[in-house]
Amino acid sequence: MNKDMLLLGIGGAGTIMTRGVLRAFGSPINAHAADTDAASGAPGDIPFTLIGGSRLAGRGSGGQPAAARAAFDDDPAVLDPAFDGIRTCVVLTALGGGTGGGATSGILKRLHAHGISTLLFATLPFSFEGHDRERSAKAEAAPLAREADVSVFLPLDELVSEAGTDNMSDALRQAHDTVASGVTLLWRLLKKPGYIRLDPERLHAAIIGAGRARFAAAAATGENRVEEALAKLAASPLLARTSGSAPVRTILVGILAGDDLRLSEVATVASGLSAAFGPDAKLELGTVNDEQTFSGRLALVVLLFEESPAVATRPARSGERALASQSRFGDTSKTTWEGEDLDVPTYLRRNLTLER
């Protein structure tokens, strides 16, 4: 098992989603989970680190981000053994209170101190959970958007809208499964590449300092499977541009199919995504040819990297202080326009709901 990439689940929901990826992938993944609640690691099916054991005694943070933050700050090196040899870390977490909201920022900083690039997927609470949870999630999202190389924020309201059920437990499970299935496709693309290779090193280079992104996946079968999968992506609110979105700078797409994948299908995907989401955007494309998993089926996984109006100042990674991006942007001051701080994402500044 190649260990240059790490899948890291933070908090209870992050751990659940990480387990979902492990189940869907079907073969060993370099994964780890961390939580203030010892019960999250009780199944013993995934390497687990307890955060703040001396402070919280494994009882969890009680939904208090400040408690989780303090617990991680007590011992910020607690996860360091899991970071050894890692180049890129995919982080799964949930915002709106608790360990995910409180500890993720500190963990991202620690990852960057180790020279590790980070791709963050964070769910946002249901709207019915109230203004306190919503305000907490927004306050937590701002530093995460600065600390992560790429941040993808996924509102549970919108994930559930694709689940097609009104049952509470089923909807939440399917929302987590939606995130897990998309991340699984991304992982499979990077770890089991086909004729057009999109390997972890290309992802590492693509995400460094990239900023915000949109993310979705779709699958279809039959004679018109490419057109159907593209139509699903075009209709997905996860990829829709809103008033809080910036133009797309880079389209990263994976095409996963069996041995029947055709060159014409690859060309249709490339042209269709460019036309729909960014005709001037750079296209990074990779394929997976896996007859056992995708026989007769075609799946697409897409990351849309948005243009960044400003680059937040962040300590340089170990060994990367000479990068041109650091020297160009390291000393920039706050960008303001009519009293608004443009370094803060628009959806946070203007209290907008993230839409897919």
Please tell me what each predicted stretch does.
Residues 1-356:
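Tubulin/FtsZ superfamily GTPase core signature
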